[in-house]
Amino acid sequence: MDRESFKRWLDSYGHAWIGRDPVAAAALYADDATYQVTPFNEPLRGRDAIYEYWDGVAKTEERIQFDSEILAVTPEHGIARWWASFVRVPPGLETKLDGIFLISLDASGRCQSLREWWHKLQ
């Protein structure tokens, strides 16, 4: 992985989230990708499971903002800090997230593995 491909992936991730587009979000992942939303839950496995997750996000979040900062890139992994804010519907609860991604991309630029850690302010 290089910095440019990681930035491109992060930008696409942000656009998919802000656009509430589960198809675009799922397209960022390899067929057999894993997505670990929290360290305490089993990872989602496969693009179909990731699509289902993002479909739920699209139905329950509005006024989404997202930004990220690359912290480190190695040939195997990218690490980024990210921020998001949105209104959860229902009940109209304003939410802010501040988190860290650990990501590996395959040769085609799709995510093979994503692990995240985040904190929430509501």
PLM features: what roles do these ranges have?
Residues 44-45, 66:
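A broad, structural micro-motif
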Residues 32-34, 94:
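Short hydrophobic/aromatic segments of transmembrane alpha-helices and their interfaces
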Residues 1-31:
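Short, low-complexity N-terminal intrinsically disordered segments enriched in polar/charged residues
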Residues 34-44, 56-58, 117:
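A short gly/proline-enriched turn/hairpin at secondary-structure junctions
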Residues 14, 39, 70-72:
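Structured beta->alpha junctions
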Residues 2-5, 21, 51-122:
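A beta-strand edge to alpha-helix "cap/lid" segment located at domain peripheries
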Residues 13-16, 36, 86:
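Alpha-helix C-capping/helix-to-loop hinge sites
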